């Protein structure tokens, strides 16, 4: 039996419907400010997509573009001004940044309540301590995608391959909050295929095209492919298509986790607006 396709587009649309419903009850319009340095084609495309989606929801969205050689201090000064601007609810600095800019310093400069990417150390701490905050969009999207398709994570053995600060680590924290039993595997994990075969839910986020083969996957497992790798003009995931022969459900690349990342950014922007005004989501 062919694996069920877990469409990120379908799940994202459900998120947008919820956002639109919540917006109708509010007396204000959320505001998002995106900062981009340089003209990297991927960054240009991602920022355009985020801005387009924000505007489609009725958010006040503005993109600020600066030259790639903008000094770090100038960027930090601009972030400080946006932190102080009561008209701005969410701030996003598009990554990656040029080599002369210290990314961690920039991420820590964004006010935690405006940190719609969820990368500020305070939000990271709140994630792991069970508190309320703004959390990274891709991990949020993975969990929301699974919930959309009725996957109950409580007690499930979930293996996450990849330990990045953007996906793997925060996803492990979110899965623990859902009462999953989580294994965080990585490049130094011994006998990785043996570890992945234990998973009832397998999430792969390593940036290595078609790394995971069907022999790595338990019969009937649910597989989420976070990888996006451009190879000879094509977008390939971290999971080989043959995995569909053994998995019960599988996310496509593209069209799986990607749309969910943007949807959760829109959700975080609304949450940021509510947290700043009321201290809780409404």
Curated annotation (Swiss-Prot):
Record-linked PROSITE patterns: THF_DHG_CYH_2 (PS00767)
Q: Name one GO molecular function term.
A: methenyltetrahydrofolate cyclohydrolase activity
Pathway(s) the chain acts in: One-carbon metabolism; tetrahydrofolate interconversion
**Keywords noted in UniProt:** Amino-acid biosynthesis, Histidine biosynthesis, Hydrolase, Methionine biosynthesis, Multifunctional enzyme, NADP, One-carbon metabolism, Oxidoreductase, Purine biosynthesis
Residues noted as binding NADP(+) in the record, renumbered to the chain: 162-164, 187, 228
Q: Does the keyword Cell division apply?
A: no
Write down a Pfam family by its short name: THF_DHG_CYH
Question: Which GO BP terms, alphabetically?
Answer: L-histidine biosynthetic process; methionine biosynthetic process; purine nucleotide biosynthetic process; tetrahydrofolate interconversion
Q: GO CC annotations?
A: cytosol
EC number(s) on record? Answer: 1.5.1.5, 3.5.4.9
Q: Where are the bilayer-spanning segments? A: none
Catalytic reactions of this protein: (6R)-5,10-methylene-5,6,7,8-tetrahydrofolate + NADP(+) = (6R)-5,10-methenyltetrahydrofolate + NADPH; (6R)-5,10-methenyltetrahydrofolate + H2O = (6R)-10-formyltetrahydrofolate + H(+)
Write down the InterPro entries for this protein, in alphabetical order.
Aminoacid_DH-like_N_sf (IPR046346), NAD(P)-bd_dom_sf (IPR036291), THF_DH/CycHdrlase (IPR000672), THF_DH/CycHdrlase_cat_dom (IPR020630), THF_DH/CycHdrlase_CS (IPR020867), THF_DH/CycHdrlase_NAD-bd_dom (IPR020631)
HAMAP family found in the cross-reference section: THF_DHG_CYH
Q: What does this protein do?
A: Catalyzes the oxidation of 5,10-methylenetetrahydrofolate to 5,10-methenyltetrahydrofolate and then the hydrolysis of 5,10-methenyltetrahydrofolate to 10-formyltetrahydrofolate.
Subunit-level organization: Homodimer.
Family assignment from sequence similarity: Belongs to the tetrahydrofolate dehydrogenase/cyclohydrolase family.
**Could you tell me what this protein is called?**
Bifunctional protein FolD
